[in-house]
Amino acid sequence: MEAMMNFTSQYTVEEALAIENEFSRLKEKCYLDHAGTTLYADSQIRSVCEGLAQNLYCNPHTSRTTEDLLDQVRYRVLRHFNTRSSEYSLIFTSGTTASLKLLAESFEFAPEGAFVYLKDSHTSVLGMREIVGTERIYPVEREQLLKELDSSERSDNEHSSLIVFPAQCNFNGVKYPLELVRKIQRDGISGYGKERFRVCLDAASFVSTSFLDLSKYQPDFVCLSFYKIFGYPTGLGALLVHHTAADQLRKKYYGGGTVKIAMAGRIFHVKRDPLVERFEDGTLAFTSIIALLQGFETLERLVPSTAGLRTIERISQQTFHIGRYCYNRLKALRHSNENAVVKLYHDTGFEDRGLQGGIVNFNILHEDGTYVGFAEVSYMASLHNILLRTGCFCNPGACQRHLQLSDEDVLKQFDAGHVCGDANDLIDGQPTGSVRVSFGYMTRKEDIDCLLEMIEKCYIRKTIANGFTRTQIVSKYKSHDQPRLKMICLFPIKSCGAFKVTTRWPLSRRGLKHDREFVIVDENGVALTQKKLAEMCLIRPQINVKTNEMTLSHPGMADFVLQLDLLGESQRIKLCQTKVCQDNVQAIDCGDQVAEWISVALQTSGLRLLKQSDEEVRTFQQSKQEIALANQAQFLLINQASVRWLADKVPDWDELHEEPTLESLVDRFRGNLIVETPKSMEECDWKRVTIGYLEFAVDGPCSRCQMICIDQGTGVKATEPLRTIGREFKGKMRFGIYLSHVNPLRDGSEQWLYCNSVVEGLSE
């Protein structure tokens, strides 16, 4: 077992160093989502760019030279899979999904033919059910498929049916015996009489780090995506068709380049004879296809073949061993009460490279055995610069099987609001998905150690806490104290520092006047936030309502004064469009001078400051209330009593030199309305709120992200208090409530919020 806990690289020292030098752009980031896409090497992209700069690549319908080059690429791809064009035709597509769709549309079933698919298949396989040319559609369980290896039935009928299964499951990396291909082609499937089956192998996950030998195993169809292997180019895949199965494909649609003749006035056409020419509609992505040559060259240079092992086989060895190291280290983690820290979702124990690929799937458990939500784990990982994948990974069957969810459970979770890709990770304490880490040829042992360190730091309690909290012994907050509005905070520039008001402040139809009215965008017009540039918090705007000026300050720089009234002069307006929280927003460019000041302050060239246009009408989802450039509501209310309660729950601030003050913690939550109530967390029960004479509706809780871990006074990131929120609320990353003004004036009259106003929360 001790040997299983260690990792020995399959590369030489020189090879490992050369590979590491190719990925210096990762800097401090730990990338563990190679099943999503692997990474391209620096030299690979330089070589691609040099080829584009030095050569003239014409449309292949124009230039025979380009067409010949594409044929070279086809030959190179087929050679990678140890086959040739006399055995397989290679049809370029936009990826595995497009290949599966093309097959589903084109496969000609016999009258009694069946479409059979493994339940543990990618969503793209499930989608084939909607368009295949048969109504006999059946899922097959993993155990049933594996039993086919021992089946003795024989089929002599013509091929009439189609089965699809993966060579490797993208959920947890388990590999399926490729002997199944020949067995099913020859003998059919138990329970389907004498039907003969064509076999489609979904090889997308498998070929990323494993050798598919098409001279030994010959599926009728193979689907794959090239970015899984090389990282670049994206949007390019292939459908490989065995020559014996070509006649079973009947394509209806035809595009440019696929016909011998087509008439405009009559419905008449004749398709080309070669399969590839019939199926590749229009102009291929020829520059992307040519770039595959650099992909092969890069892999073979960085991981050269050795005696008896191809490049891809050496990569398979490396990723398997690093996956086994990760699996065993996670399996060994224990809380102080000896309970497991991790629940693994696997069909093997990483004993055999032929049965397991480089993917590890798991959930994290609290000390009492309850689940940590995958969304929380994702947040914490991002704080530690770890990139991993969470959810169900577009494989609902494998997810359902490993999480032990019945169909009724899945529908119940859907009715409770959970949909694919959301952060609704726990429902009634049960996980809706999991955490996946996956490995490529450039993954290092240090990347796994980084993951382990994060889990140990955030989730393993080395001692069981005893004693009372400060909240239990501090009694200065009396039950008869009335809740008050302590402070108003507005953020004139989205994701920059707060402007704090302790007197009064006017409202507008969008919320607090001037709140999140401006946004900083990069040279591509993309809105910046502290998630990308934490130093934004050091830019602190101040608004002078009387002079209508905004003063920007930053440590070490002279203040910059922006005249707000000049931004409305028609001759100075420069309308721009940017995207904020998935919304396209019309905005006014504030000019070169302030752009230069911001670029210097943030040490990033090409930044611009934009102001939301007064004519812009922006709402969130179904709400009728207008909002500025805030994420989803007009106001965010934060209760100081709740922040104080949360601070007491943080076991220690080991990443900081000293415990943060209450004020600095409140600042992290970037609320607009800072209140103080007698009881902590009572705001969670409110449905409506009155502050002074103004009434507000509660729009719901605020879902938190890693921004609350940024010290707004310094820009320094830590893991708290997000870690504690996830633990205390069982993975629900929520703190604070969103409000909207119920009766804003529309006639131009101003309404004001006053600090020290009485706050009344209504729960009905």
Curated annotation (Swiss-Prot):
Residue(s) carrying N6-(pyridoxal phosphate)lysine: 228
Top-level taxon: Eukaryota
E.C. designation(s): 2.8.1.9
BP-aspect Gene Ontology terms: Mo-molybdopterin cofactor biosynthetic process; molybdopterin cofactor metabolic process
Recorded GO MF terms: lyase activity; molybdenum cofactor sulfurtransferase activity; molybdenum ion binding; pyridoxal phosphate binding
Substrates-to-products reaction catalysed: Mo-molybdopterin + L-cysteine + AH2 = thio-Mo-molybdopterin + L-alanine + A + H2O
PANTHER family: MITOCHONDRIAL AMIDOXIME REDUCING COMPONENT 1, MOLYBDOPTERIN COFACTOR SULFURASE MOSC
Stated name of the protein: Molybdenum cofactor sulfurase 1
Source species: Aedes aegypti (Yellowfever mosquito)
